[in-house]
Amino acid sequence: MSKEKQCRPGPRVPKCSRCRNHSLKTPLKGHKRFCRWKDCHCLKCKLIVDRQRVMAAQVALRRQQAQEEELGICSPEASSGPEVVVKNEAGADCLFSVEGRSGTPAPPPNPNPLSVAGSYSASSSSPSAAARVYSEEASDQPLETSYYNFYQPSRYSSYYGNLYNYQQYQQMPPSDGRLSGHSMPSQYRMHSFYPGTAYLPQGLGSPVPPYFSLEDNDGAAASFFPSSLTSTHDSTLTYRSISSLVNDGVKAEFESGGQPPSSRPTP
């Protein structure tokens, strides 16, 4: 009996970890304030300090969780696995599969229960973390289809863009062969005071016919422009008809032997 009592180990007495790092065995009870290496900054003592901080944080977290459960702020729920969010990148929609909802089957629970418990305690420890997780899940939800229909560019914009719009370039009224920047005033364009036949020598019996007459020009303009544009150029056609009548009168007067009217001032 005495041998058995001697072989039995005594009660476990906690030892000082700092003293153990320095190859000493000192009981921890009443030794914390008198430890030689309580201010030591070696690598092993730094690891001990970090371990103590982590353990203290875990204890505080457990106390806070217990207080919240007593007050009824949050109730623990037994979840087989975390929520799964599946994103379909081909389409613009997201599929959420949660327990109790119809959707894609959830994967089997994590075989490591410690990691699941640690993640659950970290997520439910503070309400701010839960709110952050909810906001992230809400941001992944699909938007309405009208949003994509409104902001999505049309596929056939290049073909149907100018179908019912106005023409791209504004059509200018037909000119008399002059440049647009060197147009003459209207009082000089209405009457031709100097026809080409007035400067011919007297020996020629008949005037040289021009390359084209104003009547031919009017016919070519009428055939070139469609009928829908004739209403927009009524003033141009009226001017041409008047000028053709005036030129015909001047030609008849010149052929009868009269002198063409001169706009030069008489001395």
UniProtKB/Swiss-Prot annotation:
Localization (cell): Nucleus
Location of the DNA-binding region in this protein: 16-63
Tissue: Testis-specific. Localizes to Sertoli cells.
Pfam families in alphabetical order: DM, Dmrt1
Entry GO MF terms: DNA-binding transcription factor activity, RNA polymerase II-specific; metal ion binding; RNA polymerase II cis-regulatory region sequence-specific DNA binding
SUPFAM superfamilies: Cysteine-rich DNA binding domain, (DM domain)
A GO biological process held by the record: male sex differentiation
InterPro entries according to UniProt: DM_DNA-bd, DM_DNA-bd_sf, DMRT, DMRT1-like
Function: Transcription factor that plays a key role in male sex determination and differentiation by controlling testis development and germ cell proliferation. Acts both as a transcription repressor and activator.
Entry's family note: Belongs to the DMRT family.
Disruption phenotype: Feminization of XY offsprings.
Gene, per the UniProt record: dmrt1y
Classification via PROSITE patterns: DM_1 (PS40000), DM_2 (PS50809)
Disordered: annotated segments: 98-121
Record keywords, A-Z: Activator, Developmental protein, Differentiation, DNA-binding, Metal-binding, Nucleus, Repressor, Sexual differentiation, Transcription, Transcription regulation, Zinc
Protein name per UniProt: Doublesex- and mab-3-related transcription factor 1Y
GO cellular component, one term: nucleus
SMART domains with a match to the protein in the record: DM (SM00301)
